[in-house]
Amino acid sequence: MSLPILYSFRRCPYAMRARMAIVRTGFQVEHREVVLRDRPAHMMEISPKGTVPVLLLNDGTVIEESLEIMEYVQSWELTTEEREWVGRNDNEFKFHLDRYKYPNRYDDVDHIEHREAASKFIQDLDKEIPIGNLSDAIFPFIRQFANHDRDWFDSQNWNNVHSWLDECLSSEEFKICMTKYEQWIQ
């Protein structure tokens, strides 16, 4: 029997979220690493929106959302509070993260204003560090934010976030999650 297929891109925080769940549960997949400027035809056929991650199950079911992949492989049902945290991360924080990290993609954007706006989420996170599945759903985005200007990030008074992120990034599961694969060519 063939394995479910996971289309992924190593540096995408949504794909990291899905891969962390897959690694933690030992869920077996055929990993297909894609380059987003050269998306495979099969991936586009099963998921025309062209974003990663995409999980194709053996019965033909396609799961296109990272959180749904997490829920599927971990049999995880988010609590109301967890849903609120993920919602803030995926909407409010991600909105500002993109404009901070990629200001040239948007009209009339001050990346420092967006860094400050994104920082409000991190300040809240510093007061209530997520654990378990919720942690895996959020930390890839905080990693991306931190890595954009690591000196600035490290200079902020977010002791709990710094410790939590360091712990996430040094975990064996994260190291496995970040294994480098060659581009999958069909």
Please name every model-derived segment.
Residues E84-D90, A137, Q183-Q186:
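Amphipathic alpha-helical surface "interface" segments used
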Residues I131-D151, N157, H162:
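GST superfamily/GST-like fold recognition
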Residues K127-L134, E172-M178:
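Surface-exposed helix-capping loop/turn segments at secondary-structure junctions
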Residues H31, E81, I112-E116, D149-L165:
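Short alpha-helical "patches" and their helix-cap loops
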Residues N159-Q186:
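Long hydrophobic alpha-helical segments typical of transmembrane helices together
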Residues E81, Q123-D126, F139-A146, L169:
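Catalytic cores of nucleotide-enabled group-transfer and carboxylate-activating enzymes in metabolic
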Residues L97, D154, I176-T179:
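Short, hydrophobic secondary-structure boundary micro-motifs
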Residues M1-I122, D126-E128:
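GST-like domain detector, emphasizing the conserved glutathione-binding G-site
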